[in-house]
Amino acid sequence: MNDEKRTGRVTIPTDLDAVPETLALMQRWGADAIRDCDGTEFPAQLRDTGAKVYATYYTTRKDNAWAKANPDEIQQCYIMSPFATAAEGKLRIPLMQGLSRELLKVNDRDDIARWWEVVDRTTGQPLPAAAWQYDKEAEAVVIPAPEAFHEYTVSFLAYLIWDPVHMYNAVVNGWTDVEHQIPFDVRQPKTHQYTLERLRRFLESHPYVDVVRFTTFFHLFTLVFDELRREKYVDWYGYSASVSPYILERFEKEAGYPFRPEYIIDQGYHNNQYRVPSKEYKDFMAFQQREVNALVREMTDIVHEYGKEAMMFLGDHWIGTEPFGDVFASSGVDAIVGSVGNGSTLRLISDIPGVKYTEGRFLPYFFPDTFHEGGDPVREAKENWVTARRAILRKPIDRIGYGGYLKLACDFPEFLTYVESVCNEFRELYDNIKGTTPYCVKRVGVLNCWGKVRSWGCHMVHHALYQKQNYSYAGVIEALSGAPFDVRFISFEDVKNDPHVLDGIDVLINVGDADTAHTGGIWWEDPAVSSAIRRFVWNGGGLIGVGEPGGHQYQGRFLQLAGVLGVEKETGFTLNYDKYNWDEHRDHFILADCPDHDMDFGEGKKSIYALEGTEILIQRDKEVQLAAHDYGQGRGVYISGLPYSFANSRALYRAILRSEERRVGKECRSRWSPYH
C-alpha cells in the first residue's frame, strides 16, 4: 500500500448531534462529501466545511399535510387475497386478512367493477362484476353462487397509507413516536404540479446544497407487511405498487387494449423476476419507464436550473427508472448511488451508462440492528469490502460512502479504524485503474428472459439477500462480477429478433430452474430461438448450463439443451431407458484449481444423468454434478449449481475457457498454455 495520504471520493453521514464526530471522521477518512439520512438532519455548522453537501430528497413523502388534503392521490398497490375454497352456499373472501392495516387501506373510492377482479383459480377465468358484491363494512367480497369446491381470489387496489420504507425504518429502529409518512402519487395531476413547486421551494431554501440525492423518485418496489409488522412480500424489481386508475387509463390509451388486474397480479406471483414475463407486463414496464423518466427529466431540469447536481439512489422508489433500460439516458440524472451488498450489486451500479459518476454505499448501515452491544460491524464491513473489491477491479465505482447514524458507529473504534483502511485502499485502487480498460479473456452472454434491463440483478429477490433456493445460481453472477470477461445480458427476445446478436458472444450461460424466466420456459418452443442457440454452439461457441438450463418439457426433452450439454434430467419419463455412462474424469482442465478436484455445488440438482459421449467430471450417487460435451465445433459444460467461492470462481473461469476453446485455433490456445 502506498503510504502517501490520499483524500476524497468518500461520503459520510451526519446529524445534528454529531458535528464534532463528523469533522473528526472527515479528516480521518478523507471524506469530501457529507449527507443527511432518513431520520437525521443536516447541521448548520457543517454547511461551510468545503465538503460537498448531499441533501436526501423525498419526492413522494415527508409532506403529510398534502397527502391528507388529497387522499385521492395517495399511492396505491395491487394486492391479491388468499385463495378461498367454495363449499356450499355463498363464499365470503376477506380482503385484509394477513395484511397490515397500518400500511394498507382498501381503495373502494374508485370503480371497483373496473379496477378489481375476482378470479376462479380452478378455471383461470375472471368472474363478471355482476357475479360478486362488496361488503364495505366487513371489507370482504361476497360471491353468492360460486362453483362448489372451486378456489377463488380477489385482486384489488389498496392505498399505501404508510410509506413501506418509512415503516421498515420505524420497525427496525423501534421508532414509536413518529408520524406515519403517507406516500403521494407524483404521477397524478394535482400532485405532479405541487411536487415541482415543492422542489423549487426546497432548492431556494437550501442554497448550501450541492447535490440533491433523490431517494428516489415515484414508485417503490413491491414491499408489503403483515398484521404483525413482519415483511410479507418483497420484490426489489416489483411494479405492483406503481399503479392507480389514472396511470392505468393512460396505459390503456397507449397500449390499445383494456387493462386487467391480472396483468399485474399474475396468479399471485406479481411478475417476480422468476416468472416468464407476459407481453402485457412487458408493455406495462415499457410504458412506465417512458412516463417515469419523462417526469424525472422535469425534476432534474429544475435541479440543474439551480446549479446543482441530481443524484438518484438505486433503490426504494426507483421502479420505472430501470437504469439499464432504453430510456434512462434521457432522464438527466447526473449520478447514481446504490447499496453495495456484494460484487454483483456493485456492478449493478458501476456498469450503469450515461451518468457522470457512480457511488457505492457500503455496509453496514449505521443502524441499531448491527451497531449494538455484542454486534460485530467490523466483520460485516470486511465481508462487504472484500466481496465488492473484486468487482471494483473490473469496473470501479467513482466514490464510496456510508449511511445511517454516525454516533452509533463512533462507539466502535475498531470499526472506524477498519473503514479508514477501506477508504485509503479504495482511493489507491481507483487511482490505478480508472480510465483503463481491463483485459477481457472472453465475451460472455448471460441468456434469460429479461436481458440487459435486469443486468447484474439476476436471481435477486431482495437486494443482495441470501435465499437457499437461489444462492447456487446467484453465485454464477457473483463470480462473473469480478472475472476477466466482457459480460453482457441477452434476452430470448433479442435472439428471436436478431440471431446475429450472438455473433458478439464467445460463451453463453443459461442458469436457473426449469420454466423460470432465467432458463426460458416456453421460449424453447420457438424453433427460431432454439435453432439459433444450437447453431451458435455448433459453429464453435461455448455454452454453460447451470441447474436446469433450458428446462421445459417439450417434444421428448426436459432439458431443451440436452443435446448441447450432453445431460438430461430424469423426471420419470425416461426411467425405462437404462443408463451406463457413469465414469468420472476428475483429472480435467476445469477442476485443476479446485482442492481435491472437487467442487461445492450448493443445493445442486437431483436426477441428472449423462447421455452417451458425455464426459462426466463429477457425479454423486449416480447424479451428474459436472459434465463436458462436444457439440459440433463447440462445447457445452453442465454444472448442477455454483455458489460463490474462490474455488468455484476458478472452476467457472476454466469452464468458460474450455467451452469456447475449440474454435479459437492453436495460436490462441497456446496463449493459455500456462493454465492448461
Regions found by a protein language model. Give the residues of each.
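Hydrophobic targeting/anchoring helices
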Residues: 46, 66-67, 199-200, 210-217, ...
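Noncatalytic N-terminal accessory/assembly modules of large enzymes
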Residues: 2-61, 65-100
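Catalytic domains of carbohydrate-active enzymes, especially glycoside hydrolases
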Residues: 11, 17-54, 198-215, 335-336, ...
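Polysaccharide-binding and catalytic clefts of secreted carbohydrate-active enzymes
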Residues: 72-330, 348, 434
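Short, Gly/Ser/Thr-enriched beta-strand-loop segments that form substrate-interacting elements
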Residues: 610-623
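The substrate-binding groove and active-site-proximal loops of carbohydrate-active enzymes
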Residues: 8-15, 30-37, 172-193, 276-293, ...
